[in-house]
Regions:
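Class I SAM-dependent methyltransferase Rossmann-like catalytic core
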Residues: 38-58
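C-terminal helical/coil "lid" or tail adjacent to the Rossmann-like core of SAM-dependent
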Residues: 40-42, 48, 229-290
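Conserved alpha-helix/loop element of class I SAM-dependent methyltransferases that forms part
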Residues: 55-74, 89
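Class I SAM-dependent methyltransferase SAM/SAH-binding core
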Residues: 77, 83-133
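A short acidic, Gly/Pro-enriched loop at the edge of an enzyme's catalytic core
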Residues: 132-143
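A short SAM/SAH-binding and catalytic strip from SAM-dependent methyltransferases
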Residues: 142-156
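A short glycine-rich, Lys/Arg-flanked "PGG" loop and its adjoining helix->strand segment in the class I
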Residues: 157-172
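Conserved catalytic/acceptor-binding region of the Class I
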Residues: 174-242, 251
Length: 307
């Protein structure tokens, strides 16, 4: 197959390796009288999840991406682009940069390409690739961008080392992750807290870490990056922000928790009545007297120049 050009970078179109990556549906298999969980993307692969990702991206553009922009001519690697929920924002904010967005899922890439075309953007190319077998030479990219990816990986430190090797000296690595342990809300609800914990536990069962946001600084330093800075980005919602009550509390966070209902019950983490009560109480925080807080973490590090 022919190679393709992204900006001034030539990308080798090689077959995918067979390494396991994170973008696969969560599944439980019956083994005797127990359920075992396979390594997977805990939120699943289906149209409703794709819609949730789009809602999340739309609600969080200013909070997460207002300070992300790349110089003209830069070649930027976006790892784990999924359905392009963040890609459109990146491309719009840096119209003269060249983006190569990769994902393991052909279906997600097809949807991402459609979104880019619909937005009239021409500075993005897509490539199907495994995160631990990226077909690029070292020091190929001016910048690397990763959003909501590390939480799904069993080896996030190894992934960051790979991304750092792909950076040119003085290039930046930007990582954004959430932390479900940062969630607080009113009215308080033990059932809602238990429902959130089901998601945290399921993600741990499949090798991920829903609490990874708090670990970004040590992870980036361990990867060898310099001048690492991590900033908390808190989503605060009350009745004065009905837009966020709908877009974030209902369509993003609670939809994400509700999406693991069947898996949590099958895994024996909860029962249907308890889980459903928790989801109802999360929706309750979007009412006129409710309050909801959640913190994302954005880390940026620079690859040092050789001594």
């Amino acid at each position: 197959m022919a190679n393709m050009m992204v900006g001034r970078l030539e990308v080798q179109d090689t077959p995918l390796r067979d390494a396991i990556w994170f973008r696969r549906c969560v599944s439980f298999e019956l083994a005797g009288d127990r359920y075992t969980v396979s390594k997977a993307y805990v939120h699943g692969y289906h149209p409703r999840e794709n819609e949730r990702l789009r809602d999340q991206a739309g609600a969080l553009v200013e909070l997460l991406h207002a300070d992300t922009a790349y110089p003209p001519g830069s070649v930027v690697l976006e790892v784990g682009c999924g359905v392009g929920a963040q890609t459109v924002t990146l491309a719009v904010q840096s119209p003269e940069a060249h983006f190569l967005s990769v994902d393991i899922s052909a279906d997600s890439l097809a949807e991402a390409e459609q979104r880019i075309r619909a937005a009239g953007l021409t500075n993005v190319r897509f490539h199907q690739a495994d995160i631990f077998a990226l077909p690029f030479a070292e020091e190929s990219f001016d910048h690397v961008f990763v959003c909501f990816v590390l939480e799904h990986l069993s080896r996030p430190a190894e992934a960051l080392e790979i991304f750092t090797r792909l950076l040119k000296p003085a290039g930046t690595l930007t990582v954004i992750e959430g932390d479900h342990g940062s969630t607080s809300f009113f009215p308080e609800s033990d059932a809602a807290s238990r429902a959130i914990q089901c998601l945290v536990t399921l993600q741990r069962m499949v090798g991920g870490n829903a609490l990874i946001g708090r670990q970004l600084y040590p992870l980036l330093v361990e990867a060898g990056l310099e001048a690492v800075k991590v900033s908390p980005r808190m989503v605060y919602v009350d009745a004065s922000r009905p837009d966020l009550a709908n877009a974030f509390i209902k369509k993003t966070f609670t939809a994400m928790v509700a999406g693991v209902r069947a898996s949590a019950i099958l895994a024996g983490l909860t029962d249907s009545d308890t889980f459903d009560a928790g989801v109802r109480d999360l929706y309750r925080t979007a009412e006129s007297d409710g309050v909801f807080c959640y913190t994302f973490f954005k880390g940026v590090g620079i690859k040092g120049r050789p001594a």
